[in-house]
Swiss-Prot record:
Region forming the signal peptide: 1-23
Gene3D superfamilies: Laminin
Gene field: EGF-like
Top-level taxon: Eukaryota
The protein's name: Epidermal growth factor-like protein
Name of a matching Pfam family: EGF_FBN_1st
Keyword Magnesium on entry: no
InterPro entries: EGF-like_dom, EGF-like_domain, FBN_EGF_N, Growth_fac_rcpt_cys_sf
Length: 317
């Protein structure tokens, strides 16, 4: 083989993925070959007879060329897979094809568009401008709401107003002629503004519907209509009120806070009580020769009697 022809063929076949040899081979008859997908996205390999990819002046040399195909006389070439189109030959690169175009978006897979931020799909599948709101009383152009004649764009840029002397509320829009249009979940009240619709047992609190507990939920929170959930250290009592809990009973007193006992009037804490949950009677003047058994009431020891009726002084009999 002429050396110049050898160099020319080598350059061509490096592009299509074949190698050149001076060995003589007999090409087999053309056969069907299923394209095989390569690891590169959208790039497939196709096996074809070498003679089909040679220029006319070199076809007579086909029998001297050994390809890299699965049979003598065949070679593998790179092509774009179905649904892809070529964008570069060196290096070989294919990109997804969307024949109808994507508008304000990019073709990310065969016939699949991904819209840019602020755009959405139109009826024809292309990406078009989408305004932040419904663009009421206006037209959406380039992701901006252009108001119809006689209407003015609201500061939030979502819709155009035609003049309302009153505020339609957070769930309403002015549609012109002093009329409010309410969004889903809102309804016109007697003042003509939009008010949130709350289910029975709920009330509007700011921008949400919250459950209603008619008696309130002191030391707890209202989690459902008429139902309180107590804070830690509290529990519902028989009156359905969140009352403090004490792990030990409060003798002659009451549980005033979680694990805190408060003595009743006329009683004081028993210094000998380990848990601080026992209260004992208090006698202001003390009980000489006796025991304070109730607030300001003494019982005399054996062999002693009250000095006088109503007295807390005990004397020997």
């Amino acid at each position: 083989m002429d050396f110049k022809i050898f160099l020319f063929l080598t350059a061509i076949f490096m592009i299509v993925g074949v190698t050149v040899s001076t060995a003589t081979t007999n090409p087999t008859a053309p056969r069907a070959y299923r394209p095989r997908i390569n690891t590169t996205a959208g790039v497939c390999e196709l096996e074809v007879p070498i003679v089909n990819i040679l220029p006319p002046e070199l076809k007579h040399t086909a029998h001297t060329i050994r390809g890299n195909g699965s049979a003598p006389g065949f070679s593998k070439i790179k092509i774009c897979c179905s649904g892809y189109k070529i964008v570069a030959h060196t290096p070989f690169h294919c990109t997804p094809d969307c024949p109808s175009g994507c508008g304000l978006g990019n073709c990310t897979a065969p016939n699949v568009c991904t819209c840019n931020k602020g755009a959405g799909f139109g009826p024809d599948g292309k990406c078009i401008s989408v305004c932040p709101g419904r663009c009421l009383n206006g037209q959406c152009y380039g992701n901006f709401c252009n108001c119809n004649s006689g209407f003015v764009l609201e500061p939030n840029g979502r819709y155009c107003t035609g003049g309302c002397t009153r505020n339609c509320g957070p769930g309403g829009q002015c549609v012109g002629n002093n009329q409010c249009s309410c969004l889903s979940g809102f309804a016109l009240n007697s003042q003509g503004t939009c008010q949130m619709i709350c289910a029975p047992g709920f009330q509007q609190m700011g921008s949400a519907c919250e459950p209603l507990c008619p008696k309130g939920c002191v030391n707890g929170e209202c989690v459902a209509p008429g139902q309180c959930r107590c804070k830690s250290g509290y529990a519902l009592n028989s009156s359905k009120v969140c009352a403090p809990k004490c792990s030990q009973p409060c003798y002659n007193g009451f549980c005033s806070a979680p694990n805190v006992c408060t003595c009743k009037e006329g009683y004081i804490k028993d210094a000998t009580s380990r848990n601080g949950n026992r209260c004992i009677a208090y006698c202001a003047a003390g009980c000489p020769n006796g025991t304070c058994s109730a607030p300001n009431f003494c019982i005399c020891k054996q062999g002693y009697i009250k000095q006088s009726k109503g007295s807390n002084v005990c004397v020997k009999q």
